[in-house]
């Protein structure tokens, strides 16, 4: 006889698989594979080597996803049979438990593959923070978010490198960019881009009044050297300045820091962590490429959302999450509507559930 806890676990796994089915439309994926296979059969397909490799990899990834999905369907069929047999044969209970463990592991693996299957999802991430208007209040909020993301990275055993750090006038930060290195760092963080809002009793207000602060987050993938993104040198304004801020003995105090402004978009990238001006410029150009890619990525997603009539709530330029610390505690994602009252845990880096909800939500728009 199957124990109650096992039955609950079976029901949960079935529910999880149904959720995955809603996101992973196998008919649509199989149709996409047919289109890619047809394209790969064209006589001129390999004329553009980079594009051909990208399409071949995409087709293979989709085929692997289909195989994994069908194997999971077979596993659930085996589970149903084992559960039925266990009603008359108690020795089959062990078989049910064994199949359950296999399914649990496969669902976790498939979910990760499905949700993190876009180009560059497996890349390292650059994460930039900028406070909104409001001086010290917003600058302090930006530093709280920086702490939240570094705590999250530590919990996931990711490496963290400070690329640029500009201290606030009284507290907090004027801006900061960090590099988070590890498996799927960009894929997990990419939907954290946007405006984050804080409501609290200000520690900087002698009258103890409630304040609202804003800070924006930008997340970009780190590209390898052969990714081609055209940048016209005439579109760049390059300034040098003296390094400073966090970093101690590892920050070069000469005029080696570099600030690059991309004139057509107004994007500004500052780097001060490398040992020479040449190295800082190279890193700044790499981050600029990543920001230009992310800008295009956001435009494409906004267009998909606009076609579904949802851009008002989910626009990249709008507020994405609110953190209320007074008069009650609540952190709420305004796109997925996922929320928790444990605001302190979130600010201590416990954001995995928010990230998973984001990935599931945006998977519908792939």
Curated annotation (Swiss-Prot):
Residue positions, PTM N5-methylglutamine: 249
Transmembrane region(s): none
A GO molecular function held by the record: translation release factor activity, codon specific
SUPFAM superfamilies (alphabetical): Release factor (SSF75620)
Domain of life of the native organism: Bacteria
Main location: cytoplasm
Compartment list: Cytoplasm
Pfam family, one: RF-1
Any one GO CC term of the record: cytoplasm
Modification(s) after translation: Methylated by PrmC. Methylation increases the termination efficiency of RF2.
Keywords attached to this entry: Cytoplasm, Methylation, Protein biosynthesis
Record family assignment: Belongs to the prokaryotic/mitochondrial release factor family.
UniProt-listed PANTHER family: CLASS I PEPTIDE CHAIN RELEASE FACTOR, PEPTIDE CHAIN RELEASE FACTOR 2
Entry-linked NCBIfam families: prfB (TIGR00020)
Functional note: Peptide chain release factor 2 directs the termination of translation in response to the peptide chain termination codons UGA and UAA.
Name recorded for this polypeptide: Peptide chain release factor 2
Gene source species: Petrotoga mobilis (strain DSM 10674 / SJ95)
């Amino acid at each position: 006889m199957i124990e109650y806890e096992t039955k609950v676990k079976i029901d949960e796994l079935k529910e999880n698989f149904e959720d995955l089915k809603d996101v992973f439309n196998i008919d649509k994926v199989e149709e996409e594979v047919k289109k890619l296979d047809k394209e790969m059969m064209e006589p001129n397909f390999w004329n553009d080597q980079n594009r051909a490799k990208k399409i071949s990899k995409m087709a293979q990834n989709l085929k692997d996803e289909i195989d994994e999905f069908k194997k999971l369907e077979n596993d659930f069929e085996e589970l149903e049979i084992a559960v039925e047999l266990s009603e008359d044969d108690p020795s089959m209970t062990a078989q049910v438990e064994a199949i359950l463990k296999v399914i649990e592991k496969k669902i976790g693996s498939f979910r990760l593959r499905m949700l993190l299957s876009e180009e560059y999802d497996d890349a390292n991430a650059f994460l930039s923070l900028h406070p909104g208007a409001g001086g010290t209040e917003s600058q302090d909020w930006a530093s709280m978010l920086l702490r939240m993301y570094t705590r999250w990275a530590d919990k996931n055993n990711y490496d963290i490198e400070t690329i640029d750090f500009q201290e606030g006038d009284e507290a907090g930060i004027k801006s900061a960019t960090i590099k988070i290195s590890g498996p799927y760092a960009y894929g997990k963080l990419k939907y954290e881009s946007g405006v984050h809002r804080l409501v609290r009793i200000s520690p900087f207000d002698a009258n103890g009044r409630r304040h609202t602060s804003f800070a924006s987050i930008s997340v970009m993938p780190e590209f390898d050297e052969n990714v081609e993104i055209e940048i016209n040198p005439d579109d760049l304004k390059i300034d040098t300045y003296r390094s400073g801020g966090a970093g101690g003995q590892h920050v070069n105090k000469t005029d080696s820091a570099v600030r690059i402004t991309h004139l057509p978009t107004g994007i500004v990238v500052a780097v001060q962590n490398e040992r020479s001006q040449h190295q800082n410029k190279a890193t700044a150009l790499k981050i600029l490429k990543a920001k230009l890619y992310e800008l295009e990525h956001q435009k494409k997603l906004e267009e998909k959302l606009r076609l579904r009539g949802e851009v008002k709530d989910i626009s990249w330029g709008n507020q994405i999450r609110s953190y209320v610390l007074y008069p009650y505690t609540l952190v709420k994602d305004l796109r997925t509507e996922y929320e928790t009252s444990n605001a302190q845990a979130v600010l201590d880096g416990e954001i995995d559930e928010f990230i998973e909800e984001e990935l599931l939500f945006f998977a519908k728009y792939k």
